Amino acid sequence: MIENINYTRIEKAIQYLVENFKQQPTLDELAQYIGISPFHFQRIFTEWAGVSPKKFLEHLTIEALKQELQDTSNLIEAAEKVGLSAQSRVYDLFVKIEAVTPQEYKSKGAGIRFEYGFSATPFGECFIVSTSRGVCEMQFSDC
């Protein structure tokens, strides 16, 4: 029974995050929306989604930012459209999640050295791509 309640809570939280990521809701705001303590919310969200609410929000934000950068060359304008107030947050988010700077992303990786390889994992074969800053792509294959 608790499992069904938690599924519903996390489904509601994910929907809320998708619809409101531009406001960059805090852990406290999310927990209040769901109706449980921030500690409990953090624990069950991470258990069900596989990442923390903060990481989930960062990934929603970076995907929206990448989409905005397709339409504009102005990084500040793109950042504002996705709810980020500072250009430094955009830079940090790109490097942390994509392992490239916003400018490198915008130039489609021109001049960056990418290394790649394959590895067997418990989840199947994994294709990994990295830059000097870290892993920038992972894909699993069932072939």
Predicted segments, located by residue:
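Residues within alpha-helical segments
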Residues: I14, V18, Q32, G50, ...
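Basic/polar phosphate-binding segments, predominantly the helix-turn-helix DNA-binding elements
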Residues: M1-I2, Q24-L57, K81-I97
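Short, charge-enriched, intrinsically disordered boundary segments that mark the beginning
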Residues: M1-E11
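Short, basic, alpha-helical segments at the C-terminal edge of helix-turn-helix-like DNA-binding modules
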Residues: N4-N6, L57-K66, E104-F114
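Low-complexity, small/basic-enriched stretches
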Residues: Q15, Q70-D71, L75-C143
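Basic, amphipathic alpha-helical hairpins
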Residues: K12-P25, F45, K66-N74
